Amino acid sequence: MKKRFVIFAMAAAMALNLAACGGNGSGNSGDSAQSAASGEASSKYKISVCLKTLSAEYWTFVKAGCDQAGIDLGVSVDVKGPTSETAFDEQQNMIETDLNSGYDAFIISPLQADTVATLIAGETKPVIALDTDVDAPEVLTFVGTGNEAAAAMGAKAAVEAAKEAGWTDITAICLSGVQGDGTATARFNGYKSGVEEAGGTFLADETQYADAVADKAVNSMEAIMQNHPEGIAIICCNNDDMAIAAARAAKGNSAYEKTVFLGFNGDKQACEAILADELTMSVAQEAYSMGYMSVEKAVAALKGEKLEDFTDSGCDIVTKENAQERLDTLNGYLGK
């Protein structure tokens, strides 16, 4: 990906002038973060955020980060998302509407990166990719996790956990997300390399695609148990919802009693499941920071600052040793 430079000082000045004249109207979903910090409300930048969905816990933390950044930075942030991560047309319609609704900048978590690249072609206002990158010159930075590296780190930890659990034949199967999705592909590649580098065997040909949802993960796990009655050491999952569902589906099967179930996101329910011995571990994304940083970068772009190609929001491995600490942190983000 080539270096992206932000040259939006003139556009930012024009946006401010338009706002002062009351000509920067936009459709607002009612989920905006407002600030009383400085200036008149009409002079605020208005930033559109379109996530992959708002129906999963992970995305509520991304939204919370976006909203808080809007408050702290004195900008209006309008967060929305489709009903599910397979509602492709719904997200496309949201993005198309927002591109023509007077926003000053756009933050997008694409369900289909190629489609989004087409939608934003020629856009002169700042565009930030969040969680999943978009290969387009209009995108100024990608804010998110290095998914492949993070998944590899998690897979290596899972291999060690499998050895500690008594497995001698370290085999792993992936419950992946939406087939063709860039994030799912990166995590798959990371899981594969991590398992193999740690000395395990990754059964790539037996990958199950479960569209990133729990109910399909149950079906996938049932298929794995039918195909492998002897048990599998590691089940690498695209997200925590899938990992928890797969672990519950395997409960009661003695061949899978010591299977390591690896999730991805490190959200609240994952921490609770780990503490309850219902999930082994999770690769934790910093969803709140990801949302917050994406708004920070959008504002920086509007001020004419130069952005790096990739803004790493960080990651960690959640196990029983640190799950409670992380749970407390996540509850703090939501004011609980």
Residue spans of the language-model regions?
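Sec-dependent N-terminal signal peptides of Gram-positive bacterial secreted proteins and lipoproteins
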Residues: 3-24
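Bacterial lipoprotein signal-peptidase II cleavage site
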Residues: 18-37
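Hinge/cleft segment of the Venus flytrap/periplasmic-binding protein
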Residues: 43, 175-179, 183, 194-198, ...
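Hydrophobic alpha-helical
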Residues: 96-100, 104-127, 191, 206, ...
